[in-house]
A protein has these predicted regions:
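Multi-pass alpha-helical transmembrane bundles in non-GPCR membrane proteins
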Residues: 2-231
Length: 231
C-alpha cells in the first residue's frame, strides 16, 4: 500500500460517521421528535400532578424519572437530526443512541418500584435493567459502529425482559395499563424493522413515528399505573 493510500485511509477513519439522510429526511426526523419532546414535557407534568394527588412520593419520583427519560431522548434526537456541523452531529449521534438505553430503563422504573410485588423482586429487576443500560451506554460511547447490531439486539432484549416477571406485574397494575404496555412494546419492536433498514430513504423517519407511537402508549400505561387512584 502506498503512503498516499495509507494517508487517505487514516483521514477517512477519522471523519465522523455520516448517515446518508437527505435534507427532507432530516427535517422530518427533527420535526417528529421535536413534537415528541413537547408531548413528553406535557405528559411528564400530568403524570407528576396526578401521581401527587392520587398516589404517593414513590409514584411521583418514578413518574418523574420516566418523563425525564422521554424528554432527554426526544431532545437529543431532535438536536442530532437538526445539526449540520459534522463534529457536533457525531457527538449527538452517540447521545441519541445512548438515550435509547436511558428510555428503556426509565420506562421500567415505575413498574418495578410501584407495581411489582414482592418489593425485593421489583428492586432486583430495577437494578438489573439500569445496570444493563449503563453497560449499553458505555459500549455505544466506545464505538457506535462496532456495537451497533449488539445495541439493537439489547434494545429488544431489555425491552421484552419484563415478560419473565409478567405474573407479578399483571397482578400489580390495571388491565388497561398492561394492555398499553404490551401494545407499546409491539410498536417499538415493529419499528426496529425500519430502524435496521434505515439506508432505505425515509425508513428512519418511519422508525421515528413508531417510537412516538410506542412512547405514547407507554405514557398511557404509566399514567394509569401510577397516576390514577388505586381501585
Amino acid at each position: 500500500m502506498s503512503e498516499t493510500s495509507v494517508s487517505e485511509t487514516a483521514v477517512t477513519e477519522k471523519k465522523p460517521y455520516q448517515k446518508p439522510y437527505t435534507v427532507g429526511e432530516e427535517i422530518f426526523n427533527s420535526v417528529t421528535h421535536g413534537v415528541g419532546a413537547l408531548l413528553s414535557i406535557a405528559g411528564t407534568v400530568l403524570v407528576i400532578v396526578f401521581a401527587a394527588i392520587n398516589r404517593g412520593p414513590m409514584e411521583v419520583v418514578t413518574g418523574s424519572l420516566f418523563g425525564a427519560s422521554l424528554i432527554i431522548l426526544y431532545t437529543m434526537s431532535t438536536l442530532y437530526h437538526a445539526l449540520t456541523n459534522p463534529t457536533a452531529k457525531k457527538v449527538f449521534q452517540i447521545l441519541d443512541h445512548n438515550t435509547i438505553f436511558l428510555l428503556i430503563a426509565g420506562t421500567y422504573t415505575p413498574y418495578t418500584l410501584c407495581c411489582i410485588k414482592p418489593v425485593w423482586l421489583g428492586w432486583t429487576i430495577f437494578g438489573c435493567i439500569w445496570g444493563a443500560a449503563v453497560l449499553g451506554i458505555v459500549f455505544s460511547s466506545i464505538s457506535l459502529e462496532k456495537f451497533r447490531k449488539l445495541s439493537t439486539f439489547c434494545y429488544i432484549l431489555m425491552g421484552w425482559g419484563i415478560i419473565f416477571a409478567i405474573k407479578p406485574l399483571k397482578d400489580g397494575m390495571p388491565k388497561f395499563s398492561l394492555i398499553m404496555l404490551v401494545l407499546g412494546g409491539v410498536l417499538y419492536s415493529l419499528g426496529c424493522i425500519f430502524y435496521v433498514k434505515k439506508s432505505i430513504k425515509y425508513f428512519h423517519s418511519i422508525w421515528h413515528i413508531f417510537v412516538v407511537g410506542g412512547s405514547l402508549l407507554h405514557w398511557f400505561s404509566v399514567f394509569w399505573a401510577i397516576g390514577m387512584p388505586v381501585e
